[in-house]
UniProtKB/Swiss-Prot annotation:
This is Putrescine aminotransferase. It catalyses: an alkane-alpha,omega-diamine + 2-oxoglutarate = an omega-aminoaldehyde + L-glutamate; putrescine + 2-oxoglutarate = 1-pyrroline + L-glutamate + H2O; cadaverine + 2-oxoglutarate = 5-aminopentanal + L-glutamate. GO terms for molecular function: diamine transaminase activity; identical protein binding; putrescine--2-oxoglutarate transaminase activity; pyridoxal phosphate binding. Its cofactor is pyridoxal 5'-phosphate.
Length: 459
């Protein structure tokens, strides 16, 4: 039965939410009521499937904790006052921590002046952020298109490559097996997981996939496409596959792909949505081997965990296809003042606190610790891998991975699996994680593995 719109109900709901936003603390009854309310609204108005997903990583089989506020730079507090060390990092958005004061202050100061741009007058922060990224990014990258997410940055990269290469008769794209580039139609065409792709077939034509890390397969595909007249417009890669399970390519793979792109006249698009902004121990993962892309995709941590923002940064040669008509590809909220303020502050924090170098140091410490645990528990752990503060623990099967996440939840450490590889648990904390907190995480992992071994033996 269709229901009639109710202004009174909408008004009451919004007023209740505003009252909640004003609160700093909740008493016991308020907490219980909010937990029930949030679960009900997720079930009835968001997506009931999310409840089952959250349920799989909670202690005792109850529904997931309801988030309330940041506890500090590296922790979250739920409505029950429980504090969790964040080793998930919002899937890579909290590189400078939760509510970093420099980022929050920049956004608040801009909010006091003008939160969104007029669309007609020139907005200064967009210009300043574009200039900053031109200075920060490698090679000849010079111009930036701003959007709101990683998926949008990939969409822009695909369109930019198409616009540049279409006059040259090049329309084919090569991505890799295990890749994740987003779930909008264009980005999904480059993504390589059937679960996400199958319901939306047919996707964009002209996308091919080759095994990640296999330079011979890449060379063969480029060559075969040339032979059949399906010349390649661009190769799109993650320097390290994040959702694929934190998969690192062999040393020399990215430089070799760059060389092949030059040989065949294809553009190189690097998707650093997850690996960028210091995550792997360099500002950008491509810098580990001095690889310079034609187009670079950024998002997630670019907004400092305070505002959503994505960026597609390209060389002048490629970006110039938009010069004559800058409205060929636009988005209303892309490059808005609040998002640009957050991004500028984030870059400032990353550089002044040398967080990429900290990520390298702390990442080595955590990786060494996890690898020692893997040696102690070879019956549970297949492999530990990663670079900087992007790490993964691969378990012997999916069930062990789920159980490890639940055990870590009991130890008040948040972790989660990857979208393309269920038995792999990703460790992706803020780069601001302290050495003491690193030790706490390793202790929690040891306890979790010990508990898992007991449960496996009992089963």
């Amino acid at each position: 039965m269709n229901r009639l719109p109710s202004s009174a109900s909408a008004l009451a709901c919004s007023a209740h939410a505003l009252n909640l936003i004003e609160k700093r603390t909740l008493d016991h009854e308020e907490m219980k009521a909010l937990n029930q309310e949030v679960r009900e609204y997720f079930k009835e108005h968001v997506n009931p499937g999310f409840l089952e997903y959250r349920k799989s990583v909670t202690a005792g089989g109850d529904y997931g904790a309801v988030e309330w506020q940041a506890g500090g730079l590296n922790t979250l507090v739920d409505t029950q006052g429980q504090e969790f060390i964040d080793c998930l990092g919002g899937f890579g958005i909290f590189n400078v921590g939760h509510r970093n004061p420099v980022v929050v202050s920049a956004v608040e100061n801009q909010l006091a002046k003008q939160p969104l741009h007029s669309q007609e007058l020139l907005d200064p922060l967009r210009a300043m952020l574009a200039k900053t990224l031109a200075a920060l990014t490698p090679g000849k990258l010079k111009y930036s298109f701003f959007c709101n997410s990683g998926t949008e940055s990939v969409e822009a990269a695909i369109k930019l490559a198409k616009a540049y290469q279409s006059p040259r008769g090049k329309f084919t794209f090569i991505a890799t097996s295990g890749a994740f580039h987003g779930k909008s139609l264009g980005a999904l065409s480059a993504t390589a997981k059937s679960t996400f792709r199958k319901p939306f077939m047919p996707l964009l034509p002209g996308f091919r996939h080759v095994p990640f890390g296999d330079i011979n397969a890449m060379r063969t595909m480029l060559s075969e496409c040339k032979k059949t007249g399906d010349d390649v417009a661009a190769v799109i890669l993650e320097p390290i596959q994040g959702e694929g399970g934190v998969i690192l390519p062999p040393t020399g793979y990215l430089p070799a792909v760059r060389k092949l792109c030059d040989e065949f006249g294809a553009l190189l698009i690097l998707d650093e949505v997850q690996t960028g902004m210091g995550r792997t121990g360099k500002m950008f993962a491509c810098e580990h081997e001095n690889v310079q892309p034609d187009i670079l995709c950024l998002a997630k941590a670019l907004g400092g965990g305070v505002m959503p923002i994505g960026a597609t940064v390209a060389t002048e040669e490629v970006f110039s296809v938009l010069f004559d008509n800058p409205f060929l590809h636009t988005t209303t909220f892309g490059g808005n003042p609040l998002a640009c303020a957050a991004a500028l502050a984030t870059i400032n924090v990353l550089l002044t606190q040398n967080l990429p170098a900290q990520a390298a140091q702390k990442g080595d410490m955590l990786l060494d610790g996890f690898r020692l645990l893997a040696q102690e528990y070879p019956d549970l752990v297949n492999e530990v891998r990663g670079k900087g503060m992007l790490m993964a623990i691969e378990f012997v099967d999916n069930e062990i991975g789920y159980d490890f996440a639940s055990e870590m939840f009991r130890q008040r450490v948040l972790v989660a699996g990857t979208l393309n590889n269920a038995k792999t648990i990703r460790i992706e904390p803020p780069l601001t994680l302290t050495l003491e907190q690193c030790e706490q995480v390793l202790k929690a992992a040891r306890k979790a593995l010990a508990a898992l071994r007991v449960s496996v033996e009992e089963a």
